[in-house]
């Protein structure tokens, strides 16, 4: 039967998905499902949606403990994180470091790795962080936001200012390194992968801003500040990750 005559398979609504049975979440069966998800072989849209829900909602206490362990290591040994922490401390009038209790791991109900709020600090979403190295990138990203907020008094409700700090955070954190993009998008357009990743992430973040009315408005904000913000590597001398 040709694919054009097969009934379309649709993913279930996220509100209708519940956590799978324990037998599906551990051991060989979880390994099998993970392999199928990574390869895409025989994976239906509903199975994909179920796996993603299960991944982000299973073993939450264990993931939070792992996140805290990774955070301790990154704060102690990551060159980029320690560099950012040092420069943020220099901006602090009291010359005090970022309080450890202002960087927390917790379960999140939004689909991103972390966030920064000037009144509360940095949140690392333990149920969305897959590795120590991903946590390092996410924390470095959020620390760029902290630095920009302290040095430039960034107003996140100004879309151009928001776009600028997002461009800088994705550029300096390492999350857009070419190898990461090659794994996601292949070898095509190799020379532009770094910039395309930064632009894509910045547009998505600005589009999610409550004062942004459309994707087009987000793209315009990013375009307007792109050249100046992409070339601003402070406090680094250059992009090295």
Curated annotation (Swiss-Prot):
A divalent metal cation binds at residues 141, 145. Its EC number is 3.4.24.-. Keywords: Hydrolase, Membrane, Metal-binding, Metalloprotease, Mitochondrion, Mitochondrion inner membrane, Protease. It is an enzyme of class 3 (hydrolase). GO terms for molecular function: metal ion binding; metalloendopeptidase activity. It is found in: Mitochondrion inner membrane. GO terms for cellular component: mitochondrial inner membrane. GO terms for biological process: mitochondrial protein processing; mitochondrial proton-transporting ATP synthase complex assembly. Its main location: mitochondrion. The active site is at residue 142. It is a peripheral membrane protein. Belongs to the peptidase M76 family. Has a dual role in the assembly of mitochondrial ATPase. Acts as a protease that removes N-terminal residues of mitochondrial ATPase CF(0) subunit 6 at the intermembrane space side. Also involved in the correct assembly of the membrane-embedded ATPase CF(0) particle, probably mediating association of subunit 6 with the subunit 9 ring. This is Mitochondrial inner membrane protease ATP23. It comes from Lodderomyces elongisporus (strain ATCC 11503 / CBS 2605 / JCM 1781 / NBRC 1676 / NRRL YB-4239) (Yeast). The gene is ATP23.
């Amino acid at each position: 039967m040709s694919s054009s005559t097969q009934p379309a398979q649709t993913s279930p609504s996220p509100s209708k998905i519940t956590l799978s049975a324990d037998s599906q979440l551990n051991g060989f069966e979880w390994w099998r499902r993970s392999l199928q998800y990574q390869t895409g072989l025989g994976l239906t849209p509903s199975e994909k949606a179920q796996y993603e829900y299960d991944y982000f909602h299973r073993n939450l206490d264990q993931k939070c403990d792992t996140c805290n362990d990774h955070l301790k290591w990154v704060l102690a040994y990551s060159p980029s994180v320690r560099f950012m922490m040092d420069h943020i401390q220099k901006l602090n009038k009291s010359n005090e470091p970022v309080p450890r209790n202002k960087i927390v791991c917790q379960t999140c109900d939004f689909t991103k790795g972390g966030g920064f709020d000037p009144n509360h600090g940095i949140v690392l979403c333990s149920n969305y962080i897959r590795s120590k190295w991903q946590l390092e990138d996410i924390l470095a990203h959020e620390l760029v936001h902290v630095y920009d907020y302290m040095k430039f008094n960034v107003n996140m409700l100004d879309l151009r200012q928001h776009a600028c700090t997002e461009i800088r955070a994705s550029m300096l954190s390492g999350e857009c390194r070419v190898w990461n993009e090659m794994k996601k998008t292949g070898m095509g357009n190799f020379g532009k992968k770094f910039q395309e990743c930064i632009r894509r992430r910045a547009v998505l973040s600005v589009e999610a801003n409550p004062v942004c009315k459309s994707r087009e408005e987000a793209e315009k904000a990013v375009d307007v500040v792109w050249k100046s913000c992409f070339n601003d590597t402070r406090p680094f001398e250059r992009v090295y990750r």
